[in-house]
Amino acid sequence: MIRVTRLALVGALLPLTLAACGPTEEPAPASDGGTADTAESGAESDGTLTLYSGRNEELVQPVLDDFTSETGIEVEIRYADTAAMAAQLLEEGENSPADAFLAQDAGALGAVSAEGLLQDLPQETLDLVPDTYESADGTWVGLTGRSRVLAYNTQAVSEDELPASVQELTGPEWTGRVGVAPTNASFQSFVTAMRVLEGEDAAATWLADLAANDPQIREKNGEIVADVDSGAIDAGLVNHYYLYELAAEKGVAPEELDVALHFFPGGDTGALVNISGMGLVGEQADGDAQALVDYLLSEAGQTYFVEQTSEYPMIEGLEGPAGLPALKDLETPDIDLNDLEDLQTTISMITEAGLL
Amino acid sequence: MALAATAVALLPLGYLLLRTAEGGLASWWETVATERVARLTATSLSLAVVVTVACLVIGVGSAWLVTRSNTPGRAPLAVLLALPLAVPSYVAAFTWVSVSDLWSGDPSARFEGFGAAALVLTLYTYPYVYLPVAAALARVDPSQEEVARSLGRGPWRTLLTVTLPQVRPAIAGGGLLAALYVLADFGAVSILRLDTFTRAIFTALSSGFNRSMALTLATVLVLLTLGILWGEGRTRRAGARFSTASVSRPATPLDLGPWRFVGTGALVVVVLTALGVPALSLARWMAAGSSAGQAWDRIGDAAWGSLSASLLGALLTVALALPVGLLAARHPGRLSALLERAAYLAHALPGVVVGLSLVFFGVTVALPLYQTTWLLALAYASLFLPLAVAAVASAAAQAPPSLEEAAQSLGSSPARVFTRVTLPLTLPGIGAGAALVFLTAMKELPATLLLRPTGMDTLATRLWSATGIGRYAEAAPYALLLVALAAVPTWVVVRRTGIVPAGSGAPRSDRSVPTATAPAPAEPVVSP
């Protein structure tokens, strides 16, 4: 009720001040050492928080239910695409009913953060996660890691045929055989990484060569993995965990599928590890949203992701998903996720190559 | 009232102008004057033209066959022909791709591109033409045709020169709706990989969260819509025709001779391809996957969410459409034409743009309504107003104004004339419009995701959620229920509008007792 009244008041006043809507207010200075409960207004928990989730309900609802039974804090959840959710948050601005934003990739968190809509996270939270997997300004943290891989059909591709680098996929031996999802954020982040690591020209060349090599274009990673499993495509560039979702849907063990994962070696761009992550939206009236971040980064929360979504944990001391190489053993490219912000150039390059 | 309705329709447009004006004309022009935009324009327009022409052929042809000929099986077919409208384009396209994959071993021969998009969009859009034309044909007074026939005109010339001109407003309105639907569609073109404006708008939004690019592209879509509206307006210039009787009686079905079986065959082919392919795919998904059981726990909530939001949306839309439609039909003139046309402008905008504009409207102007079912219903009204306006206007155009004049001359107040004469005469059209809005709202996705109350599910959002991670078995029950629920209002409307003789399961009985089954639209058919 309090919230409704407050919102109504803002609603009545807002048209008057709309024109004055400039840059958002700076968030309160980050508490150095103070816990979330004492930060900001220091208000008591009201036992409820609103979460905007850009991750799929089937994947995250169970862990959110665990959080509620653990803490007694109810979570009101909106589900939509990460991109649509980011657009909605940007449109809502300071009037957003959201307390927290759970996103599928770093780019969306970066876009919302760039508009000043995310709060600074306390240092203890940031300390839990490697610097590579959090925002440079401390406004969001990674919750899970996902690696780019080449999913390949074990009947159609022999192990010695597997490429050492994504660069090889533009060669004649892969003509018509490689599935890609150019509209997908994970593909775009990977291309951005290629631009950062190897330069604009190299990335443009790779895209043009790929486009000329008759790639199999799909809308989603999941479609690529399913088509690789069925043999419609020989191989495809995807995130690693889609294979486990396919196995769950078909009700079989992952090894029984005709699709397997190839992790690119030697720090190749094709082995980029991206994150799903979370940021706190707007003024935090209480510590409820922070409690959710704490829970998702706790051993229980992280174990859920490892076991149920086959993603890599962000905190130390936890094993990665069974059957996969450990995160620290992956030969990932040397790149900071914060450097992947410039998506516009990437998109125009992908468009130019004729893949979008 | 009509102005209020227009304001609702223009909300998204105002938002677009506000947002693009922030960037300035120079940057707008820089974004728009590119080769890509030219290509998108060409693709979008060609697709709209091809699909609209195909929809007119299938829609008018099938409407005529089920209402005016002795084609066997036309009563069940009349209902089935409306059903493809209940299949969301994203479900349709996906099931077509997955069925075509069964046959095609060659991945490069994948079912995608212009032809695929045109085929799928036609099969699931033609009911926009079929429904209003069939309703109009069922109500048109057959006496003029009988006169024409008795004066020696052949059946085909009578059809072309007498019958079709009488239902021209319904044909033009239906064609316009189909064209605008194609411009706004995202589901089919994205799955079938055809780069249209809507897909480019979604891509700009979803990759890079580039709202200004997306909205700039949307303004071009508005310009295209204006062009289409202008073109359609020119075809209408000959003016509306009014039938002369107050209550029509069914026309005597034309005996097609042996050709009647060809007619049935053609209708069956349309129904089977449009409904059979999704049915086949959904059955396969149910059988193949392991996640189907998860749908049953939540399907009730989702169905309730769909029904309540769509019903509220349909009621609101019809309430807003009534004054616009009546004004356009009764007082044709520059102002009423302008108001009516304005209603169409938001219809060609993709749901996500309308959704975003109402997010903006919600948080800045109507915060207490934000993320309530009311704002969602308003979004449906904004998106689907033309569906109801077209239905009301074409029904009103056929109801003779002479009856209203007579009532007025006998001393009835305007309000009484409205409730006792105008409303009953236009009710079948209103019913058809309400059902169209109801059906379309049930399958709407992007705006629903943005605007629904937090925690509320609809069948479409659950379907989206399940397919998002490849749980097709779980998606299948939602898709099936969505189509099944949408089938109920379709059936009721088909009966009420007189496409199928009311109260009679046997289609031939209308020949023996032509007047006994005359529809008497005296009770409200707002929405089932």
Where do the model's predicted regions map?
Chain A
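C-terminal motif of bacterial Sec signal peptides marking the signal peptidase cleavage site
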Residues: L16-A20
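An extracytoplasmic/periplasmic, membrane-proximal ligand-sensing/linker region
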Residues: D201-A203, E311-L356
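A ligand-binding cleft/hinge motif common to bilobed small-molecule-binding domains
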Residues: G107-A111, A235-D258
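Early extracytoplasmic/lumenal segment of secretory-pathway proteins
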Residues: G22-P23, D37, G42-G110, L356
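A bilobed periplasmic-binding-protein/Venus flytrap-type ligand-binding module shared by bacterial periplasmic
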Residues: V149-A156, R195, V273-G287, Y295, ...
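Periplasmic-binding protein-like
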Residues: R146, R177-P182, L207-A211, I217-R218, E255-G282, Y295-L318
